[in-house]
């Protein structure tokens, strides 16, 4: 939209990490482009790209973090709240170990927000991520809560976030395990009402498994009897 030239390299169009090292790929692309956005898997890949590219490298998504989504989510919460962000509370419920849970925790800490994570303890962010969030919160005044009680997590919040229960690249076999662990963390009308806030908003980075109108959604319904998974 702004007139810049862009090139998309899909996985099959690049030999990065396969026949060509990440370091060499970074050096070549850095000579050809003014900036690079990477969307893939390991955080260590984008960090190596950034080390050797010589141009700005943006994180479009890794297993661990999703900062570009955070820009959109922070803007959305600011636009749809009558309060400044440092007076706003939000909750993330579901599997909090991956990029969305990690990133929302750090985002809220950096912006001085009231951040709630509602998830089984085994699906909380890593100890390192939690420690980093608490360290930032000491500087910004953010409030951080991690709880296994979904209703406690959403009480009084303005926004309820969630994400898919099975992430990119994970096998179908993990669905049953996640459903067993997370069935009490589905975002339902009842959970929204538990916020006690009639103006509470729901947020999801998408795509969401919220009905049977996709192949995966229909397979989940036929296999597990769920019409919608993380939200319904």
From Swiss-Prot:
Its EC number is 2.1.3.3. Carbamoyl phosphate binds at residues 15, 39, 66-69, 204-207, 232. It catalyses: carbamoyl phosphate + L-ornithine = L-citrulline + phosphate + H(+). L-ornithine binds at residues 99, 163, 167-168. Signal peptide: none annotated. Changing residue 101 to A: In strain: CCUG 17915L. Gene3D superfamilies: Aspartate/ornithine carbamoyltransferase. SUPFAM superfamilies: Aspartate/ornithine carbamoyltransferase. One of its GO terms (molecular function) is ornithine carbamoyltransferase activity. This is Ornithine carbamoyltransferase. One of its GO terms (cellular component) is cytoplasm. Belongs to the aspartate/ornithine carbamoyltransferase superfamily. OTCase family. InterPro entries: Asp/Orn_carbamoyltranf_P-bd, Asp/Orn_carbamoylTrfase, Asp/Orn_carbamoylTrfase_sf, Asp_carbamoyltransf_Asp/Orn-bd, Orn/put_carbamltrans. Reversibly catalyzes the transfer of the carbamoyl group from carbamoyl phosphate (CP) to the N(epsilon) atom of ornithine (ORN) to produce L-citrulline. Changing residue 88 to I: In strain: CCUG 17915L. GO terms for biological process: arginine biosynthetic process via ornithine; citrulline biosynthetic process; L-arginine biosynthetic process. It is an enzyme of class 2 (transferase). Changing residue 155 to K: In strain: CCUG 17915L. The record marks 79 as: Important for structural integrity. Pfam families: OTCace, OTCace_N. Pathway: Amino-acid biosynthesis; L-arginine biosynthesis; L-arginine from L-ornithine and carbamoyl phosphate: step 1/3. It is found in: Cytoplasm. Keywords: Amino-acid biosynthesis, Arginine biosynthesis, Cytoplasm, Transferase.
């Amino acid at each position: 939209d702004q007139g810049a030239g862009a090139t998309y390299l899909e996985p099959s169009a690049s030999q990065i990490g396969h026949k060509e090292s990440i370091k060499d790929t970074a050096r070549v692309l850095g000579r050809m482009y003014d900036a690079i956005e990477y969307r893939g898997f390991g955080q260590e890949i984008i960090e190596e790209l950034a080390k050797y590219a010589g141009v700005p490298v943006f994180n479009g998504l890794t297993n661990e973090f999703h900062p570009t989504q955070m820009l959109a989510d922070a803007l959305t919460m600011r636009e749809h709240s009558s309060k400044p962000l440092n007076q706003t509370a939000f909750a993330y419920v579901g599997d909090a170990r991956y990029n969305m849970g990690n990133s929302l925790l750090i985002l809220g800490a950096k912006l001085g927000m009231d951040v709630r994570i509602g998830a089984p303890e085994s699906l909380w962010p890593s100890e390192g991520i939690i420690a980093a969030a608490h360290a930032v919160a000491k500087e910004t005044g953010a409030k951080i809560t991690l709880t296994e009680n979904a209703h406690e997590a959403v009480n009084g919040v303005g926004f309820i976030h969630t994400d898919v229960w099975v992430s990119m690249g994970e096998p179908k076999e993990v669905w049953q395990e996640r459903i067993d662990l997370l069935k009490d963390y589905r975002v339902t009308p009842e959970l929204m009402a538990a916020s006690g806030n009639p103006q509470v908003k729901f947020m999801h980075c998408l795509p969401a498994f919220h009905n049977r109108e996709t192949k995966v959604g229909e397979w989940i319904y036929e296999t597990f009897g769920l019409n919608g998974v993380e939200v319904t």
